[in-house]
Amino acid sequence: MAAKQEFESRFAKHKDELEWLFMELYHNREGLEVLEREMAEAYNARSAELKALDKARSADPEWYKRGNMFGMTMYTDLFAGNLKELAKKLPYLKEQKLTYLHLMPLLQMPHPHNDGGYAVEDFDTVDPALGTNKDLENLTRELRKAGISLCLDFVMNHTASTHRWAMAAKAGDPWFQAYYHLYEDRTIPDQYEQTVPQVFPNTAPGNFTWCEEMHKWVLTTFHDYQWDLNYANPAVFVDMTKSILHLSLIHISEPTR
């Protein structure tokens, strides 16, 4: 009961704004109820340590703006090889007076083509080449003990074409086809191409890729193996939020950039 009251007290500060924005965008009460339920369940699952951190951050909302904040950005594999080895570098990070560590994408990705980790196959699982979710949790806990907050890139725009949603879409599942921007012919894609710039015009020209399995054009703003998500679909918003909440339970205090 105490945990429920804590959540409701914290949520009350943002509830009206969240509900107004969600309904303005989606006009979907059922989706809103699912989102709020997921948020409550995630809060209840948070450890006492994380809830104490929540309270401290709420009492000092400007903590990250202080002049003594010093951050570093790195790819885990290039700096240390994997998450376990990165944890062994903690003395060096402390020596640098680090307070904020930003790790580039490390969630499960296809190999070898993954756009530096920005093509994500599973938003809830660390890439096996870098370690496990437990390794990430242990690293984050040790960083916090050292006064270092961990930040991860969370790739919200797209999934890998090998993500389970994309695979289900290719197999003809209409529910998951609605997770992406799909077109039967070039009418709308050609209208896009008239005004939308290309991110990689030399190596990945165009913003759409033909999917032979579906016989449809897929919006792929970056590479052909990165399928843009359709945020006009409330289920996409809710599912992506669930993955952010999942990361927050692995002791990550700042899961997104």
Where are these regions (language model features)?
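Acidic/aromatic-lined carbohydrate-recognition and catalytic surfaces
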Residues: 1-238, 245
